Amino acid sequence: MSDIWKEFSWLTISEAAAYLGVEAKAIRSWLKDVSLLALPSPEDGKLRIPQVFLVAAESEGDYRGPLEVLRGTLILLRDGGFSDAEAMNWMLSEDDSLGDTPLNALRAGRKKAVRRVAGALAL
């Protein structure tokens, strides 16, 4: 398993809000409805979100927020008994059956393949 804390850029709730140009309450709402996932940092215990989970608007009016296909996958993993840490590690670590990280596969439009693997793991 990779060391996700070293391989990715992590943002606090306020940093994620600033990155997206939204209020911190929007980030907390996305965390509550499982559109986003955060883990306590091993360094300071503050909740942190991987920046790669976020979509920043490139121009006025563009979508900004969590990667839209993330929510269904996170719910599937939670329903299957994955802890938040296990779900985060799986999303950010290479999966042999996908040939990539599940997150990269989702970003590439391979939602069905990712959810099929997640469903099999959650059994």
Predicted regions span which residues?
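Non-transmembrane "mature" sequence context
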Residues: 1-123
